[in-house]
Amino acid sequence: MVTRQGPLHASTKQQGDAAETRALAWLQARGLRLEERNYRVARGPHARGGEIDLVMRAADGTLVFVEVRQRRGSGHGGAAASVGGVKQQRLLHAAQHYLQRYATPPPCRFDVLALDGDGIEWLQAAFDASS
């Protein structure tokens, strides 16, 4: 099997990292401050794993858990539609774990930053813990 790597054929991880870097710069330009990138919770024998792409802090103190999704086009609903129930549950699990570091957790929300081609769509409060 032949695999192609290089500038024209970036790996899925490289593409994801580039999308997260683009999303981070875009959010910072809108006043959000990075708290942590790629926060991971390991999968255990009785627990789901999870990862939060970006943990940001809004100017009002709200902790913003950001899922970055990239798609080349809007087929199958585009990037935003790819954050379904299972993915939301993994994000919620990781966020609950992250919030354990606070004696009094700050207000928080779950955003999706959808990169479809050259466009960026910011879905603030895309879902909540009751979803």
Go through each PLM region and give its residues.
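Short, low-complexity, polybasic intrinsically disordered segments
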Residues: 118-131
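Anionic group-transfer/hydrolysis microenvironments
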Residues: 38, 53-55, 69, 113, ...
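A short, glycine/Asx- and small/polar-enriched loop/turn
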Residues: 46-51
